[in-house]
Amino acid sequence: MPAKNHRRAFGLKILNASHHGVRQLKRDGAVAEIHGNKFWNSSYLIMDYLKKTPLPKRSRVLEIGCGWGLLGLYCAKQFGNRAHGIDADKNVLPYLDLHADINEVRMTREGKTFNQLTTDYLRDFDVILGADICFWDEMTRQLF
């Protein structure tokens, strides 16, 4: 029986490190520098909440500290939201693209830090989501 290289949750296919696409990205040099080396389960909590309390259709969603982007992809796939992800580590963005392709969902993304978020930038979004984004104490100061 072949090794399982992905799992399914909340209507999404989530790749494991053993998936050939993930391994190829690593070989190509997309090595995470700030804890974006995998999908973090904390996004499940928000997905579970959103499943019970859905976002309005076509909401403009910003996922901050998106990593592999599964939270934004969930919103795009389940609610038809327009999702955009930002992460300080540009090396994780190819993993978001891979998951978007595998899940047949469109999500835009860019490398950006919390300090680069301005009021004008945030006005373009209806909802801001982030899961497990303050893993260092000094990161909370940047958000508040």
Predicted regions and their residues:
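S-adenosylmethionine-dependent methyltransferases
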Residues: 1-144
